[in-house]
């Protein structure tokens, strides 16, 4: 084993140390959160070694030491894949998680079970690392299910609240639908290719691969909250803010997109699957951006923004640019985690107030949070030379110059423009104007745990895109030339969104309240999707099952088995007895005498 493989395994091993301490006195002490945070920061520093080695030499590796099990002709080994995706993703995820854990020490300090909370966060990170470094489908599935169950536990952390429990069950149920697709894809690979190792699957590269790829797209739709299976993501905001920052920025929600990126050698020659992925992503990115426009809960706006960015990543995979989608995953993690943490800072200081209509004027009382929120919003919209620009601008350029569906491209551009609108809306409502919160509210943002974590992520939101894009070797052929107007499209639509938001804000400040329009209702009620999908199918299945139960069980089976069958038997007996009355003399006369 060389330095490359040993540091990768050391990084994974170091993360498991605090979990092993569960039965010791450290776990019971109040130093445990600090211990977990230091462990994650150490793992981050260790993970930089293979990343630097990779950027200098381009070295990739598969660590396949442990033979696991042999089933007839299938050999399963515990193997780790240290390639472009896992080596780059690990430091990003660890850096973001380190900041989130430091933020959690401030945000969750009064929680009586804070040690268990930190253990859950760490377990969540470990399962994500298993998913990212897995080299066969079975190992990947362990990580896949791990992030699912940990998200259930973390979303339902405040289990005394009905909304939190409902949201946790909703998340797990929507993910079950995706898991069915994953299991079906695994079954297809096993029965047709007799292997779960990724190298062998890609080497065989079956020509008729529509079925397994459809299963993988269904899995990605469930995990990455694409249109149709998206309602769980805004509902998951019922969990604590650090959970929202960890799940919905860098880890769980990108797992679905990451799965499709892993399988890009199979998808790159399959035009049908690419078109499906692109159209699905385009619908998601526009629909969720529209939903974000009229929400009033600050966390829900950022959650819909996450879903919109995931749709953009799916579009990127659909135009055959998986490495670009991966770059967007890495850059997006920094500013999205920071946006969630800024909202957490505001919510915590305003005594758990999440409605942006009850905020305002926070730029005076919370200057640092204001700065980070504005930087994060600008990075999200793709303002030049911030982190988001380096991936988002490239995605729009690649989409503009690709020979693919112009409809998908057009609605992606509209969604990009809407990103600027809802980002501006948060800034106007929460930070500017007059304070609309109670005057007795005590606001202080002088805790180093909060400030240091936000500072680190703000540095990432400004510089990470530049560092990543200039140090990672290009894996796909970049676009050589394009007209200037195509080059400027992304910036133009973003500026259009900003202008539109400013214009609407200035014009509507003095207007009287009117009856809401149909488009406003559509956006506020999330396209009527939860209302229809969470009411009609359960109602139909419930009434159908009640009718079946009452007509088949009560009316037919239960009545026939006891009351009616007994009555029928007694009726026959009584009829027989009554028919025999007065016939004794006749029977005696029949008896022959000898």
From Swiss-Prot:
User: Where mainly found?
Assistant: mitochondrion
BP-aspect Gene Ontology terms: electron transport coupled proton transport; mitochondrial electron transport, NADH to ubiquinone; mitochondrial respiratory chain complex I assembly
* Reaction(s) this enzyme catalyzes, per UniProt: a ubiquinone + NADH + 5 H(+)(in) = a ubiquinol + NAD(+) + 4 H(+)(out)
| Residues passing through the membrane, by range | 1-21, 43-63, 87-107, 114-134, 137-157, 171-191, 211-233, 241-261, 272-292, 301-320, 325-347, 366-386, 409-429, 457-477, 486-506
Any single Gene Ontology cellular-component annotation: mitochondrial inner membrane
Q: Which UniProt keywords apply?
A: Electron transport, Membrane, Mitochondrion, Mitochondrion inner membrane, NAD, Respiratory chain, Translocase, Transmembrane, Transmembrane helix, Transport, Ubiquinone
Q: NADP: is it a keyword of this entry?
A: no
The EC number(s) this enzyme carries: 7.1.1.2
Q: What are the disulphide bonds in this sequence?
A: none
Give the membrane topology, semicolon-separated if more than one: Multi-pass membrane protein
Q: Looking at the keywords, is Membrane present?
A: yes
The record's annotation in InterPro entries points to: NADH_DH_su5_C (IPR010934), NADHpl_OxRdtase_5_subgr (IPR018393), ND/Mrp_TM (IPR001750), NU5C-like (IPR003945), Proton_antipo_N (IPR001516)
List locations, semicolon-separated: Mitochondrion inner membrane
Care to name a GO molecular-function term for this sequence?
A: NADH dehydrogenase (ubiquinone) activity
Database matches in PANTHER family:
NADH-UBIQUINONE OXIDOREDUCTASE CHAIN 5 (PTHR42829:SF2)
Q: Which NCBIfam families match?
A: NDH_I_L
The family classification in the record reads:
Belongs to the complex I subunit 5 family.
Q: How does it assemble?
A: Core subunit of respiratory chain NADH dehydrogenase (Complex I) which is composed of 45 different subunits.
Q: What function does this protein fulfil?
A: Core subunit of the mitochondrial membrane respiratory chain NADH dehydrogenase (Complex I) which catalyzes electron transfer from NADH through the respiratory chain, using ubiquinone as an electron acceptor. Essential for the catalytic activity and assembly of complex I.
Q: What name is this protein filed under? A: NADH-ubiquinone oxidoreductase chain 5
* Gene name linked to the record: MT-ND5
